[in-house]
UniProtKB/Swiss-Prot annotation:
Predominant cellular place of this UniProt entry's protein: nucleus
GO cellular component entries: nucleus
Family per similarity comment: Belongs to the archaeal Rpo5/eukaryotic RPB5 RNA polymerase subunit family.
Lineage per the UniProt record: Eukaryota, Viridiplantae, Streptophyta, Embryophyta, Tracheophyta
Organism: Arabidopsis thaliana (Mouse-ear cress)
Any one GO molecular-function label of the UniProt entry: DNA-directed RNA polymerase activity
Subcellular location: Nucleus
UniProt record, GO biological process: DNA-templated transcription
InterPro entries associated with the record: Arch_Rpo5/euc_Rpb5 (IPR014381), RNA_pol_Rpb5_N (IPR005571), RNA_pol_Rpb5_N_sf (IPR036710), RNA_pol_subH/Rpb5_C (IPR000783), RPB5-like_sf (IPR035913)
Keywords: Nucleus
Listed PANTHER family: DNA-DIRECTED RNA POLYMERASE SUBUNIT 5-LIKE PROTEIN 1 (PTHR10535:SF15), DNA-DIRECTED RNA POLYMERASES I, II, AND III SUBUNIT RPABC1 (PTHR10535)
Designated name of the protein: DNA-directed RNA polymerase subunit 5-like protein 1
Amino acid sequence: MSDMDDEITRIFKVRRTVLQMLRDRGYTIEESDLNLKREEFVQRFCKTMNKVNKEALFVSANKGPNPADKIYVFYPEGPKVGVPVIKKEVAIKMRDDKVHRGIVVVPMAITAPARMAVSELNKMLTIEVFEEAELVTNITEHKLVNKYYVLDDQAKKKLLNTYTVQDTQLPRILVTDPLARYYGLKRGQVVKIRRSDATSLDYYTYRFAV
């Protein structure tokens, strides 16, 4: 298999994981997209010189009936993504379209100035950056990984009232945890985790994102 074939296969797997991640966050993703075969991926996204057209990989997805609750996924070209891409290609499009959440998938770590730009932009937007290597496989598909459910504000309030606790009294999970990143956890949110004991009975625990 050639290097180009390897790259196509890698990006095919990355795209599949991204779509699964969006689905697991509650966004509407077509089954036909989730189940796209590699051959179909090549026909759809590799029309020039057997190379993936990353611009065509762009995703726009909605969560539930609210059209304002939308997310964009960007796949910038080039091995190293810097400030111009983050500010001009990502942030400007999100602002123009009034989309407040976005994911940027990059081949390798973004530059230090780009990280600073993302941090600054995240005061107004939510921009997540994933490296392709993090998405080649879906970490939630491992049989030992527990199922996560991110509580909305109403469910969180009900939980805290039921147990008469403050959210800060719950066990914590870092927003940098790989599973927290997969589910897009923000600081202050609560996640419900389904676990199984030795008898295969399910039980639930809760974590407060910090």
